[in-house]
A protein has these predicted regions:
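N-terminal secretory targeting modules
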Residues: 1-27, 32-40, 45, 49-59, ...
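Short beta->alpha junction loops
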Residues: 64-72
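Oxyanion-hole/transition-state-stabilizing segment in secreted/luminal serine hydrolases
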Residues: 13, 17, 25-27, 33, ...
Length: 144
């Protein structure tokens, strides 16, 4: 996978500046869903969508939120088509950072999500969001 190709984002911004109709999608868990937001408009997904609306007023945007609390990329790869991709998105942000564990199986399912998005016929710009944290252990080995 190429982790540093901005061509799809540049094309998305070009199309938005040209006034095209675009679909902005999100796939993830509870953070994407908007859990614990004080109101729906404060959820990160809606705020990103609203940024597109405010920045490119000449375009019409559709908002697709495929966030379901408590789900990981294992479930996300299975529902990517029905929850987001069937709407032919031009942009998809992905966040499973809280629910995915750092184990090979989850890394494979996360990669499956990314590959599914990148190979979808609408060629969406894909932005991956991750939460980086470190568990502190008092013993020399995390397994002790």
């Amino acid at each position: 996978m190429n982790t540093s190709n901005f061509a799809r984002l540049k094309e998305l911004f070009r199309r938005a500046a040209a006034g095209q109709e675009l679909t902005i999608g999100f796939l993830g868990g509870s953070i994407t869903q908007g859990s614990l937001s004080t109101q729906p408009g404060n959820a990160y997904a809606f705020r990103v969508y609203q940024w597109f609306v405010d920045t490119f007023p000449q375009s019409k945007f559709h908002y697709v939120n495929g966030g379901i609390g408590g789900t990981s990329s294992h479930y996300g790869v299975a529902r990517a088509v029905t929850d987001v991709l069937m709407y032919q998105p031009d942009f998809v942000a992905v966040d499973f950072s809280v629910n995915d564990l750092e184990v090979p199986f989850r890394q494979e399912t996360y990669e499956g999500v990314v590959r599914k998005l990148l190979t979808w016929p609408s060629h969406p710009a894909v932005v991956l969001l991750n939460n980086i944290y470190c568990l502190l252990y008092t013993s020399p080995s995390p397994r002790d």
